[in-house]
């Protein structure tokens, strides 16, 4: 196998994730590269083929019915490694950012102090077709949280600092694919997970389940929850199916639901069951 240092070919204007300025492998990459070095000849190629077969069998694809020229979703055998201390800083910053966005939503759908004080231009909100005036709470009990999901696009600049490219708050996709990719990688390259302290993702699923349950009305001990999908023609239908299984909730379409007296019910063979919260 050729020198792993030869894998790095970043231009001078870009940050080299693998190699330092002194041409040495960064410490947090040494574990995974050591595992790859230890594989027998052709081992990595065989692992990649195995992973791709698993993804095909599980149906982990992105439907490209509207764009036949779009590239397919492919498996990258080399995971992106982030040092623990660096991830801790990223995590803290993203939590703070998500909390800020949630408080902004709570204000816009509540007292609207940001508009009254001129910190946010009123026309920016009222002229936006996505602003749901009927959901504004002027009296009564407001939701404990408005932003249930949050994703972000990050980029690292040449100086090594991370910057936010875009915030995604309207049903961001990708979590299901990340979970499936981790599962397949763990089965295809188990040596890495035995020798490297990898942070597991199960807690993410558990917390997501708990956050959905928290959206149910007060006093509901065992809320009925579901994942709502547009159907099998959706570009991310695999993710909807996968998340429903991981969250242990039913996958439903619009035709499975009915509304009576402003309450959503899930239609079943025998009766209709009140739906307390859902992921869409």
Task: Indicate where each model-derived feature is located.
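Preference for protein termini
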Residues: 1-279
